[in-house]
Every structure is written in structure tokens, then in C-alpha cells.
Regions:
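A short, glycine/small-residue-rich beta-strand->loop->alpha-helix junction that serves as a flexible
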Residues: 104-115
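Active-site proximal beta-strand in glycosyltransferases
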Residues: 206-209, 215-233
């Protein structure tokens, strides 16, 4: 449950700073946890980054204005405000009670988890700010995410039509391709392109990201307190964001991510630091669980009386 995350997060809030990165001439990020990545694995991401700059542009020197607007859809119920990047307006962040919910709106699962985080944060007295990195059309960040989303959607649709494509391409990519540290190495480097959207956001406000890209981008931008809420129980290096607190929903996921299971073939890797990974339970909306005992008792009574369960 999110409430476990709150206790863990508050306990570790002051001690979890971004670990200092030492960047060598090849552009390799080298910290204790990341030394298990090979130099070639990390440096190979540079040509990919150059290609993205060529295709989508480089806005690393842009100073996008940031504003806060009321969310007309979930704002009234969950107290959510939108962070708008590239729009002029008031940006009065609540630095004591504010918490950013970072997402990319890629798939309903990530969106649902974002709503659960915002719901629980609101119930606990925090002020959730909704930061959708896929909604800032003028930025390199959104252009990159949008292109990836289009590509993934095309592959997903094709996998439903072609059994051969699904067997030879789609399933291997999702089960093993995204699992590899080499994939994560390039992804972490590319996330630097997304960092400018955080430029004018106070760095002390916690970020809870429901996809790894908002977490990685936040870290590159210098956000000090980043929680990476991993959605998948199947352990994949895709979901790693070094410097963040990683959270998982099941014991199975905890074991797999702790030992980086299968992320470099059959190699036995150094484990994730104990203070970088926490089992929190499922990410569930406050509204769904706050009355769960009474609701379940009512269902049992209806069953005993031969009435409909719902």
C-alpha cells in the first residue's frame, strides 16, 4: 500500500541524495551500483543520443517557463494541479506539502498508478502536482516520448495480428530485450534529453514517478528526492533509475530486482543497494481501500442472504 511508501520515504528523505556521478571522457556514468555496466555498454548510447538530437532537436539550453494550473478532471476529487511547461503563469509550488506525480501517459496501467499515488498523497495531506512528460509538445522530451509511444503502439497492434511477429519479435523484446542492462544504459543516457522540463521546478519537492523516464529525467535535472514506482513484477533493467528509491509491489519483484536477475545473461551481478529498493505492496487508490473492511462485510452479508454480491 502507498502508506508503507510514505513511512519509508519520510524515514529516508534526508539521507537519500543523488549519488555523485563521475563522468569519464567516454561519457560513462560510474558509481558503485553502476560499475557493473561495461564501458562499451554505456558509451554506445552516445550515437543514439546524437541521432535523437538530429531528429527532435536539442533544447538543453532552453529555459521553459513553468506554471501551475488546476486539473479540471481529477483536481476537484484528488486535489491535483497540473504542472505546465512552456506556459506562462503562476508557479507557487507548496515546498512543504507538495509532491510531484511524474508520468508519461503511455498506457492505462501507468496512468492508473499515477492516480493511485495522487489519491493516496492527497488523503495523507499532501498536495499532488501532476507532471505529464508527454504533454509538453514543444520540448524534445515530449517529442522523444511521443515517438517511442507511437512505435510501441504500432508493435503492440502488429503483435495482435501476426503470430510470427509476436513470437519472433514482440515477446522476446518485452521479456528479454527490456530486461538487459544494455537497454537501460542507453535509456538512462537518453533521459538527459528530458531533463529541461524540470528546469524551473524547486529541486526539494519529492517526485514519485510511475514510469522510469520521469524518474531518470528528474535525477538528471538535479531533483533531490526521487521515488521510482516500478509498475512491473517481471524484473527488467528498463525500470532502473540510479539515485532514486525504487519501490515494487510484490515479494517476487523485490527478490528479482534486488539481485538484478537475468539482466546480464547468466552473470551473477552486484545487488542493488538495500536502501535503494523497497517492497511497498500494491499501488491502490485511497478511495478503494479506505472503506474496504465495511465493503467486504456488506458483500459477505449479501451473499449469506442470497442477494447479488454487488
Amino acid at each position: 500500500m502507498f502508506y508503507n511508501l510514505k513511512r519509508k520515504f519520510e524515514k529516508n528523505l534526508n539521507k537519500h541524495k543523488i549519488r555523485k556521478e563521475v563522468v569519464d571522457d567516454a561519457g560513462t556514468i560510474e558509481t558503485d551500483f553502476w560499475k557493473q555496466h561495461s564501458i562499451g555498454c554505456l558509451s554506445k548510447s552516445s550515437p543514439v543520443e546524437a541521432e535523437i538530437y538530429r531528429k527532435f532537436g536539442d533544447d538543453s539550453t532552453k529555459n521553459y517557463p513553468t506554471s501551475i494550473k488546476a486539473n479540471p478532471y481529477i483536481g476537484p476529487e484528488l486535489g491535483v494541479s497540473d504542472i505546465r511547461v512552456g506556459e506562462e503563469g503562476a508557479a507557487d509550488f507548496h515546498t512543504e506539502k507538495g509532491i510531484i506525480v511524474g508520468n508519461i501517459r503511455m498506457g492505462f496501467g501507468h496512468y492508473r498508478i499515477s492516480m493511485a499515488i495522487a489519491s493516496a498523497a492527497h488523503a495523507l495531506g499532501y498536495e499532488p502536482y501532476w507532471m505529464d512528460l508527454n504533454s509538453y509538445g514543444q520540448t524534445t522530451c515530449t517529442k522523444v516520448i511521443g515517438a517511442q509511444n507511437d512505435l510501441y503502439s504500432m508493435g503492440s497492434r502488429l503483435s495482435q495480428k501476426s503470430r510470427l511477429f509476436n513470437r519472433l519479435v514482440w515477446e522476446p523484446m518485452n521479456y528479454e530485450g527490456f530486461r538487459k542492462l544494455t537497454y537501460n544504459a542507453a535509456d538512462q543516457k537518453n533521459a538527459e534529453l528530458m531533463a529541461p522540463v524540470y528546469a524551473n521546478i524547486p529541486k526539494d519537492i519529492p517526485v514519485v514517478a510511475t514510469h522510469v523516464w520521469p524518474a531518470q529525467a528528474a535525477l538528471h535535472a538535479g531533483m533531490k528526492y526521487v521515488v521510482n514506482a516500478i509498475p512491473d513484477n517481471w524484473q527488467m533493467a528498463l525500470h532502473l533509475a540510479e539515485g532514486s528509491i525504487h519501490t515494487v509491489q510484490t515479494h517476487y519483484a523485490y527478490q528479482g530486482y534486488r539481485i538484478l536477475n537475468g539482466m546480464q545473461g547468466n552473470d551473477v551481478l552486484n545487488p542493488m543497494p538495500e536502501d535503494a529498493l523497497f517492497y511497498t505492496g500494491h499501488y491502490v487508490d485511497h478511495e478503494l481501500v479506505s472503506n474496504i473492511e465495511t465493503d467486504c462485510a456488506a458483500r459477505k452479508q449479501r451473499k449469506e442472504e442470497g442477494k447479488p454480491m454487488r
